[in-house]
Amino acid sequence: MAKISAAQVKELRDKTGVGMMDAKKALVETEGDMEKAVDVLREKGVAKAEKKSGRVAAEGIAAVAIKDNKAAIVEINCETDSVASTDKFKNLVTEVADKIAEEEPASVDDALALKTANGTVKDDVIETTQVTGEKISLRRFQVVEKGADQSFGSYIHNGGQIAALVVLDGADSATAKDVAMHVAAINPEYVNREQVPADRLAHEKDVLVKEALNEGKPEKIVEKMVEGRLNKWLSEISLDDQEFVKDSDQTVAHFVESKGGKVSSFIRFEVGEGIEKKADNFIDEVMNQIKD
């Protein structure tokens, strides 16, 4: 059996970020072959990732990468905010977002198959799982392409808990960034009221009519009252009609128009939205750790 030196163990740990005992075991298993040891650890990393696949990864980072006329907004999840704050995880998010913006994959599976310096994006995710000990997952992304007369604007809030990407027609990137900040803060649902689906509009109107009648309002004034309430609701969910967060004396549409443009589209990601966090009791948590 080959003798394994402390220097070899350190080198392998530096390459992979694993613990001392894991590094030593891999070197013993491969009789000191550094490259094979890296492969062994990566294979064990796959096993770790599969073992952790039942966990809920609801923390993480949302990020935006802009590459020429393309931009990607990405969410990558982990299990705890402490891992989300590590350089290892942050670097993974940055590299994956950049790669997605460059390559424009069609799906998460396609994104995971993209080539990187270490193999593929999936390999990088697995390695991060191995180093951090947590389930890491590329949850979602969108890629947007802009025209020559359009501009991108992005805004990241609270270290990546919220990311917003905006495309403007005719206005500059500084204006787009201001609008992205508004989107991150206010969370509109549509660019303008014309985008609100007809069935949703009809449903809201029906609810408002019944609400007004239940308040005992005379039928002859219900229609006018509902019209006012419906208009207020539309202004609350439509970006163009919202009071601009940096200047409540004007709407977002007026602000952008004053800069010579209009809003084309926006995307907003909030980390963990729609993910139901698993609530383990203390005993279950300890038992799960023992099983790991």
From Swiss-Prot:
* Keywords noted in UniProt: Cytoplasm, Elongation factor, Protein biosynthesis
Q: Where is this region: Involved in Mg(2+) ion dislocation from EF-Tu?
A: 80-83
Localization, per the record, is:
Cytoplasm
Q: What is its main location?
A: cytoplasm
Q: Which GO terms describe its molecular function?
A: translation elongation factor activity
Q: Which CDD domains match?
A: UBA_EF-Ts
User: Can you supply one Gene Ontology CC term for this chain's record?
Assistant: cytoplasm
Q: InterPro entries from the xrefs?
A: EF-Ts_dimer_sf, Transl_elong_EFTs/EF1B, Transl_elong_EFTs/EF1B_dimer, Transl_elong_Ts_CS, UBA-like_sf
Q: Where are the transmembrane segments?
A: none
A Pfam family hit: EF_TS
What family classification does the UniProt entry report for this protein?
Belongs to the EF-Ts family.
Q: What does this protein do?
A: Associates with the EF-Tu.GDP complex and induces the exchange of GDP to GTP. It remains bound to the aminoacyl-tRNA.EF-Tu.GTP complex up to the GTP hydrolysis stage on the ribosome.
Recorded protein name is Elongation factor Ts
- According to its UniProt entry, this protein's organism is Lactiplantibacillus plantarum (strain ATCC BAA-793 / NCIMB 8826 / WCFS1) (Lactobacillus plantarum)
